[in-house]
Curated annotation (Swiss-Prot):
Subcellular location: Endoplasmic reticulum membrane; Golgi apparatus membrane
Protein name, UniProt field: Probable isoprenylcysteine alpha-carbonyl methylesterase ICME
Function of the molecule: Catalyzes the demethylation of isoprenylcysteine methylesters.
GO cellular component: endoplasmic reticulum membrane; Golgi membrane
Membrane topology field: Multi-pass membrane protein
Family annotation (InterPro entries): AB_hydrolase_fold, BD-FAE-like_dom, GDXG_lipolytic_enzyme
Naturally occurring in which organism (per UniProt): Oryza sativa subsp. japonica (Rice)
GO molecular function, one term: prenylcysteine methylesterase activity
Keywords, alphabetical: Endoplasmic reticulum, Golgi apparatus, Hydrolase, Membrane, Transmembrane, Transmembrane helix
Signal peptide residues on this chain, from the entry's feature table: none
Amino acid sequence: MQPASPVSGDAGPVAEAVPPRGAPQVLVRRRSVPFSPDSPLAPGSRGGGERRSTFREDVSHAAAETYLVTRLAFILLRYLGVGYRWISQLAALIIYAILLMPGFIRVGYYYFFSRQVLRSVIYGDQPRNRLDLYIPRDPKKPSPVVAFVTGGAWIIGYKAWGALLGRRLAERGIIVACIDYRNFPQGTISDMVSDASDGISFVCETVGAYGGDPNQIYLMGQSAGAHIAACALLEQAAKESRGEQISWSVTQIKAYFGLSGGYNIENLVDHFHERGLYRSIFLSIMEGKKSLPHFSPETVAKKLCPETIALLPQIVLLHGTDDYSIPFSASETFAGVLKQAGAKAKLLLYEGKTHTDVFLQDPLRGGRDKLVEDVISVIHADDADAREKDALAPIPGRLVSEWQIKLAHRISPF
């Protein structure tokens, strides 16, 4: 398969953007509707005040998605064949999930029943073009917004994986939009990046309708989602610097947070193969070996002109030093390349933390979460009132027993 452009230029238009960082741009805009806290948009609805979906439509969508996931699972099994690595990884994943199930159940209850969660808001016309919104309770002013692209090895990503992060940030006055996207084999990397870009465009254009501040939009991705979001960001910056028509502007993004991401996938093919993501599957996801440089943000960043680099927002890369799914050197090297190119890049390493410690085990443990605090410190850097509230914020309670978390840490397939 030939390399495809990672983002689509014909996604929905955007709302009024922040002042540009120095490049011409052609933004396509559409009407948005002011936010009304008394009448939140229903799950399954479109943004901008469009028609809400009916119960029958929701049931029909759920049935169609279930059928689709089942069919794609069998297709994926044909790709995987019988291999001890992925079978052992699957077994470890099942045990890992059972150990953390008490926490997952409590987060799931919040996800399905909290009035602060708007599930399956439609952002595009492709399958799985939906996102979940986590809305702060009783906001007194427009809230900062984080557009979050979930991980999942490009195969098992799902918007609900961001529920715990969404809850924690919403409790601190930040709106979170968890963007779903087509996974493999339903789509390949260009589809994933295109979906993510369309989701970001939707957030930028409708943020005001949900009580968000259009001048405080942040982009974040975790694991494969960090890679996808970085691809979308760099491609959008390149298109913007060339003066092409765009559906959202990188100048609307105040900062990008990349958590446990891989940014030079050319260097990770063999590593992933040893971890159970077989080379043949990974190259199919990435649309062939020739496409690897095109979808490696680190490689792309080396070739960007100074005008494009100047458009990029602050980039914050976060990684655990004991991450064996994606070594922390991936973030370390990418940060160095960005700095050398003139970008504003910052690297935060979490000593002794694995791929899932930072994102799952630590938040389930309760107490002050280092990752959440680091992200909030960037978002609230210019808001003295918010920082005062952060200092007095309630400490989250424990969701899973310590022995279960420690055992899950040892068994985790990630």
